Amino acid sequence: MKKAWEAWTNISLVIRILIGLIIGAVLGLVVPQATAIGILGDIFVGALKAIAPLLVFFLVISSLSNATNSHGGVIRTVIILYMFSTFLAAFIAVIASKLFPVEMVLVDAVTDTAAPQGVVEVLKNLPMNVVSNPISSLANANYVGILAWAVLIGLAFKAANDATKKVLNDISMGLSQVVTWIINLAPAGILGLVFTTVSQNGMDIFTSYGKLLLVLVGCMLFIYFVTNPILVFWCIRKNPYPLILKCLKKSAITAFFTRSSAANIPVNMKACEEFGLDKDTYSVTIPLGATINMDGAAITITVMTMATAATLGIGVDIPSAIILSVLAALSACGASGVAGGSLLLIPLACSLFGIPDTTAYQVVAVGFIIGVVQDSVETALNSSSDLLLSAAAEMRQWRLSGKEIKF
């Protein structure tokens, strides 16, 4: 038994995940009634979500309390990349929607959760989350609040003695080890998640909303494989695709199936460590990216709004399209603070064209129907871009300082 386990763990994690994926899909088609299999996925996602807030909190405190150099330049570059790529994603989505207009069959509205009434309300979430109670922030996975308090506490602990700093470092190292153990459970977790998806949804979603999904997923793939490489090349001045593919393998696969940027934070941090990035930097930029780097959300908001306008016969001129891009980018940055995420920001964007809430909520309902694909690809794009842009920004610093870039 021990030899079998060692042989299994010696196989590449990606290969093990693919094996779990295939087994989960087959079981979902053959025995869809065996719902207990899906518990494996729930346990895996729950474990990642549980460890992530603690990992971020102590990693940031430990990094800042022990830091001897300033990393403001790299962090500033990462934030600029996050904001620019989100706007670019919204703008690309507008162009794609104009080139490939989609009309939808609207369904009954989803009205369980109230959508924000304006972009000010959406952006208000960010500063309010900063001053949230730190215990509440940890319990509710409010990463803006966790980051804010961890930064303050970390700076305060810079004056602590070496023994205290060592304890903080030991705690962060211990949590990192727990993350490694959890990530090794990914094959079983992915098996459960894929089983649930296949057994509950089958393949009907692709026939009913195929064209809409093609535009959404096409935009997201374009951002990851065309525009993101341009940003990475600007940073490192060499072929970006080896890094692109490495981030895809390390981050996007798990993010696709967990459908949670928060749950993927430990995965991204582990990848940053393997890339040789500075812990003082990525301990801040990765959780920050899970909050404000929302390329996928910007695409979803834009494409769904443009599809609604096309369905209702509303023309969208160039100035309106640019305004929509800005609005979608700003709204996407606050998506993590809104229940329902990007889908419930669609009514806000629809209001730009005078589309009534009753119709907008029908579009939200369509979003929930296609969510099994849309949300999976969106999360994969968002989370893997956090890793990619964090790595690119630090490697830019390596290039400027004459250090060799390896990945």
Where are these regions (language model features)?
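Juxtamembrane helix-boundary/capping and inter-helix hinge elements in multi-pass membrane proteins
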Residues: 64-73, 159-163, 201, 237-240, ...
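Helix-loop-helix junctions within the multi-pass membrane cores of secondary transporters/permeases
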Residues: 250-332, 389, 400-407
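Signature of multi-pass transmembrane helix bundles
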Residues: 4-30, 45-48, 73-242, 406-407
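Active-site-adjacent helical/loop segments in soluble small-molecule enzymes
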Residues: 50-62
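Transmembrane alpha-helical segments and their short flanking loops
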Residues: 303-407
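Hydrophobic transmembrane alpha-helical segments of multi-pass transport and channel proteins
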Residues: 47, 83-87, 91, 217-221, ...
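Transmembrane helix boundary and interhelical junction motifs in multipass membrane proteins
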Residues: 55, 189, 260-268, 298-304, ...
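Membrane-interfacial loop-to-helix junctions in multi-pass transporters
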Residues: 13, 48-52, 140-144, 179-184, ...
